[in-house]
Amino acid sequence: METRSENVLEVCDLRTHFRTDDGLVKAVDGVSFTVKRGETLGIVGESGSGKSVTCLSAMRLVSKPPAFHPTGAIYFGDTNLLSLTEPEIQKLRGERLAMIFQDPLTSLNPYLTVARQLTEVLEVHQDARPAAARRTSIEMLERVGIPDADSRIDQYPHQFSGGMRQRVMIAMALLCGPEVLFADEPTTALDVTI
């Protein structure tokens, strides 16, 4: 029999509902799955079936209110993510749990350079010094196929094509080597080379 600690992620009867002016919306209604370390799980469904909300719920990124979880649990190892305080979940996000969002244009801050957005991840989660964080960020941009990464890192998101912005999002999600990576249509804007 498998134990909870054998699974890196276990979602049990997750329900994410939203209270709206038009009534209750059951975006996720009874989803369960497990992911073992090193395993890949694909969630497939029609548009609007709750795939993105499932990932956002697991990362604790749905706004409460209007969202709420009438039942369910999301275990990361032996820890139920739904029972954590906001500071506790923030310690896990970015370092041990990461997400590549569907739309990099709205996920990247247009007022900050790519360098600032990438290095902040390392400075916050790994106490990296600015120079080391910059070096690691440039290396990650190179790994995801951004040419001239050492100069492009100082540009703003609007100076990148859609595919290059998506590569920045992938680099950001991978920077800390997370144990669980949620990828919400991560290759929509990419060419086939990544």
Language-model features and meaning:
Residues 118, 170, 194:
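Hydrophobic anchor residue at the start of the ABC signature
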Residues 69-80:
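Conserved ABC transporter NBD signature motif
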Residues 44-45:
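The feature captures the beta-strand-to-loop junction immediately N-terminal to the Walker
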Residues 175-179:
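A short, proline-enriched helix->beta-strand linker immediately N-terminal to the Walker B motif
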Residues 19-22, 60-65, 83-89, 112, ...:
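ABC-type ATPase nucleotide-binding domains, specifically the catalytic core motifs of the NBD
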Residues 181-184:
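Catalytic Walker B motif of ABC-type/P-loop ATPase nucleotide-binding domains
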